[in-house]
């Protein structure tokens, strides 16, 4: 059984025009040539929303290399416009990202590295807005969907042909409507887990690309406890296992969504104010290291992380290490840190 030793190895560099980085959530994220690529995301530089703070989305994209447990910034560039909450997909030596360009269209970005410098090419556009969906590349097609398309959650999974630049609806997801699900390609199949809407979801499904068939997978239940994967991220632990970190507490989430959507007037304002001022521990976000065995379709857990449980972070896997990068640690409060664990 794995024992992961987590170390805080640094703070992400400030965005252009800022004195320091307070952290962002909803990141562009991936690994190219064993180097970390992440950026964009959103935060609240002016403080909590109940104190007048407003959400700011950022343009900065970072290229980091980790040498001797030291984080080395190789490159920092700005995209043409701010990006956040779009899906990322690693494929070979490239990273794909779907970026909302305006209120009716998105660009498909292709990120590469040359001479330790980031390059961004816009390789296509689609007449849809895409947020908090999944994305994976298989057989030169970028699959995306099962999340917010044009502002509404959809079960549709689209495929975008990277060669012909055409896209179509591939299939319909069999689970409930949701956003922020997790995805992974394994043995010619698409694995989809979690996400949420008014409630969190712990169910999983497998889509076999060639047969175009969905099957149900094991729910995220360990020691008789059902874990929420909403807001969590996962990455490759080894050839047959994925590591999951973070995620909202299912009961706290459901209660908050219910009250914020049903209370009115002074009661709503009072609850909202108290909600954002709660201490981190009151939100009970998941600190357990969950492990999904792709081969056996089983869930287990290792230990607990030794830092605040994140949501909307980047969990990235290189050859030898795993990195948890930024994210939020409670609603509207972010973390600027990079944490590292050896596999």
Segments from the language model and where they lie:
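Kelch-like beta-propeller repeat domains
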Residues: 1-343
């Amino acid at each position: 059984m794995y024992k992961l030793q987590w170390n805080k190895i640094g703070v992400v560099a400030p965005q252009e025009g800022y004195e320091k980085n307070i952290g962002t959530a909803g990141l562009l994220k991936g690994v190219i040539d064993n180097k970390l690529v992440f950026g964009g995301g959103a935060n609240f530089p002016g403080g909590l929303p109940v104190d007048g703070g407003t959400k700011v989305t950022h343009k900065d994209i970072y290229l980091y290399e980790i040498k001797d447990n030291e984080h080395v910034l190789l490159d920092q560039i700005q995209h043409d416009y701010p990006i956040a909450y779009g899906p990322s997909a690693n494929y070979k030596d490239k990273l794909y990202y779907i970026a909302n360009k305006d209120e009716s269209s998105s660009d498909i970005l292709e990120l590469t590295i040359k001479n330790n410098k980031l390059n961004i090419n816009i390789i296509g556009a689609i007449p849809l807005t895409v947020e908090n969906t999944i994305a994976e590349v298989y057989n030169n097609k970028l699959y995306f969907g099962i999340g917010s398309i044009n502002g509404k959650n959809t079960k549709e999974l689209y495929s975008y042909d990277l060669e012909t630049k055409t896209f179509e609806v591939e299939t319909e997801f069999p689970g409930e409507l949701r956003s922020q699900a997790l995805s992974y390609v394994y043995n010619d199949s698409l694995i989809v887990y979690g996400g949420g809407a008014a409630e969190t979801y712990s169910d999983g499904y497998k889509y076999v690309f060639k047969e175009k068939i969905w099957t149900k997978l094991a729910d995220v239940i360990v020691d008789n406890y059902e874990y929420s994967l909403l807001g969590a991220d996962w990455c490759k632990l080894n050839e047959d296992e994925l590591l999951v970190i973070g995620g909202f507490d299912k009961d706290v989430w459901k209660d908050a969504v219910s009250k914020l959507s049903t209370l009115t007037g002074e009661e709503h304002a009072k609850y909202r104010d108290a909600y954002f001022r709660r201490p981190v521990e009151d939100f009970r976000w998941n600190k357990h290291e969950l492990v999904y065995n792709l081969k056996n379709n089983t869930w287990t857990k290792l230990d607990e992380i030794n830092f605040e449980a994140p949501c909307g972070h980047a969990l990235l896997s290189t050859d030898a290490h795993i990195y948890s990068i930024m994210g939020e640690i409670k609603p509207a409060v972010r973390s600027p840190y990079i944490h590292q664990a050896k596999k």
